[in-house]
Amino acid sequence: MRVIVLGSGVIGVASAYYLARQGAEVTVLDRQSGPAEETSFGNAGQISPGYSTPWAAPGIPFKAVKWMFQHHAPLAINLDGSMWQLQWMAQMLKNCNPQSYAVNKERMMRVAEYSRDCLRELRKDTGIHYENRAKGTLQLFRKEAQMEAVQRDISVLEECGVSYELLNGNELGRVEPALANAQDKLVGGLHLPNDETGDCYLFTNALAQIAKELGVNFQFNQNVEKLIVEGDQIKGVQVNGKVLTADRYVLAFGSYSRDFLKPLDLQLPVYPVKGYSLTIPIVDPAFAPQSTVLDETYKIAITRFDQRIRVGGMAELSGFNLGLNEDRRATLQMVTQDLFPGGDMAQASFWTGLRPMTPDSTPIIGATRFKNLFLNTGHGTLGWTMACGSGKLISDIVLNHKTDISTDGLSIQRYSHAHAA
């Protein structure tokens, strides 16, 4: 079976790898010069199934209003004048209730836990290296109210069988020794020992090389113009004025998936949520993290690679604007210096990317009303966490194989206005 995968971020490359491993003849098309050159390039680096939490949560509307008046707020909303932005925010607000939160979190954790298992199996099979560590993640609380609020998430972790440890402030240094210097600022933390970390860019490029060895044909610097539709099927994809054909097509264009599907009247509710990161060389390992630390107050993740610290976070709703906002850099630097001042900030590199976010935070993985068009997009901040599982799922769906886990609630069908099948 011939399959064209559109997109070479971590989701697209993982899809191509698993399709090829199961015998498909795969071509990957991308406008960039190589894999992982956009959203997958500089993300925060954590693989955190246990922290797969919907952004649409009870209390978020109130917090969003409060954050509008804070200098180092984790969320910024810049109205871009589009009706789509307002519609997306309204859809998200509809999910900010306990019932929707529970449904969405279960879906997210189902994919994320499966994905971690797939990643471990892939690592065992291929020996792939990407500055990976398996030392867990630690969520930090600066306020007692945060310690109390985390009980809701702990109950979900217990239901899903996820190992965890709730720590007092004076116990944090046992997990992250460098935090012994910051104990007076912290009241406690939630440690998930089974989470992992790694450089998504290195992983995606290494996996692309493995996929090439399986026969995947990567075509970069391509102007992917449109899908050619005939009835309820895709007949081809127009690239640089020419039409390429396959038996089946997988769309993994991230934030750009929605506009690409507009001519097909598939209303994909994926909005670009802008995030930022700093990559900082380590000069003093004693003041650097061992794994990933999540600052609950500022919603910022600080991750250890081999000789670098990756600091990522923020959520900015400003359309497809890729400008670098120095205020966001100041927030990332402030949190890093406060907790782990072991890096050379003068040599830090500043980056931004667009996360493809759905209103319910759950990715869109599965079939459409077009018989040979499949979607693998909308992973938001969890594309790295969910990549391998999503790639394996979509490959099984495309090739009509039985999936390892339930796909209930993952396809575009959950958005009734999208007319999905």
UniProtKB/Swiss-Prot annotation:
It catalyses: a D-alpha-amino acid + A + H2O = a 2-oxocarboxylate + AH2 + NH4(+). Keywords: FAD, Flavoprotein, Oxidoreductase. InterPro entries: DadA, FAD-dep_OxRdtase, FAD/NAD-bd_sf. Its cofactor is FAD. GO terms for cellular component: cytoplasm; plasma membrane. Its EC number is 1.4.99.-. GO terms for biological process: D-alanine catabolic process. The keyword Transferase does not apply. GO terms for molecular function: D-amino-acid dehydrogenase activity. Pathway: Amino-acid degradation; D-alanine degradation; NH(3) and pyruvate from D-alanine: step 1/1. It comes from the Bacteria. FAD binds at residues 3-17. HAMAP family: DadA. Belongs to the DadA oxidoreductase family. Oxidative deamination of D-amino acids. This is D-amino acid dehydrogenase. The lineage of its organism: Bacteria, Pseudomonadati, Pseudomonadota, Gammaproteobacteria, Moraxellales.
